From Swiss-Prot:
Residues 324-350 are annotated as: Disordered. This is Neuraminidase. It comes from the Viruses. It comes from Influenza A virus (strain A/Hong Kong/1/1968 H3N2). Residues 333-342 have a biased composition (Low complexity). Its EC number is 3.2.1.18.
Amino acid sequence: MNPNQKIITIGSVSLTIATVCFLMQIAILVTTVTLHFKQYECDSPASNQVMPCEPIIIERNITEIVYLNNTTIEKEICPKVVEYRNWSKPQCQITGFAPFSKDNSIRLSAGGDIWVTREPYVSCDHGKCYQFALGQGTTLDNKHSNDTIHDRIPHRTLLMNELGVPFHLGTRQVCIAWSSSSCHDGKAWLHVCITGDDKNATASFIYDGRLVDSIGSWSQNILRTQESECVCINGTCTVVMTDGSASGRADTRILFIEEGKIVHISPLSGSAQHVEECSCYPRYPGVRCICRDNWKGSNRPVVDINMEDYSIDSSYVCSGLVGDTPRNDDRSSNSNCRNPNNERGNQGVKGWAFDNGDDVWMGRTISKDLRSGYETFKVIGGWSTPNSKSQINRQVIVDSDNRSGYSGIFSVEGKSCINRCFYVELIRGRKQETRVWWTSNSIVVFCGTSGTYGTGSWPDGANINFMPI
């Protein structure tokens, strides 16, 4: 082969290779463009399928980057559609309660910057549970903690942390409040925050981080709310609020809120005489609350809320083993399901119970006179039979030698049923412990279980002599 033929042969081979490479690049480009614009259509409905009219909120939109021969292909991951909660699953059948969480706030305050709080509660969104409390605008090892036994000051704020995380200096202050309630409707958090003058307080309704609505005091006598979670069903949230005497007739109203906006207000009706600090839970299609009668009864009021027509009914827990403190001893206590028992009704403490068919699960202080100790049990017929007193499955949560305080319920949706959980406020400091000038709390949390369980006691556990004065 002469030199000219060699040159022609090499040129032909080079041209062929270049042509093949060019065609491969075109193929890669076409593939890239096709994949990019197709965007994995996430099971798009057929063109003739009717689409829902309600808005769809995209929780997150993740882009996954795949590298192929130095060519970048973007693949869209199907977004998760967030829906309102409806709580339509049945209630879990339980044998008792198992330990879930304890924040040890007071013990940690002996050597760290932890907020002074009271009125704690727990509420969950679809993924996590959070603890809330009303802060006093100060940490414990701080002179501002002196005399924090007072309930209503303008520096109190609603604190929010993931459950089990004590309220440290980095804790978020959700709103200004000396009375509050919070709940998640499936899309965002609603916070009801009350602050201001005793005779002219304001309730702010904060939804998804924005102030949406407000309402002023209607009886000019300490507007107040639940101090535990509200409940939302299909986008409508309900919260119980009271304004008026703490030891006489008061004006209780049930508010209905949609995305932070008040859409209806219903007055309390039924036989309950005095209603405060309700502990509410979803009982699809409605909401049920167990409350505090601070006037006439040591048996607890029941408020039933119809979420469809906004109607309200009220009565009292039937169990003759009553739930409030102070109360008569169990041999002489009574309840007829409809009326306050007029047994040591003045004063009281926030508490909880929930129905289980004809029976009732409940918690209360072990002491009938003081906020000391804490126990739970089931009363056979306690939801349907007047003055029923047959108690089973008793558990000690806090032994009688240690202090307790408020308690309340919260609900957690599982794969097949809705579980009931409760928290107990463990108060420390004044009035009882006069070595120190502050009043604060930690919490312990239990949840319903269908399994077996042991025994124990879970008090606050701080040595008051180790604490800042």
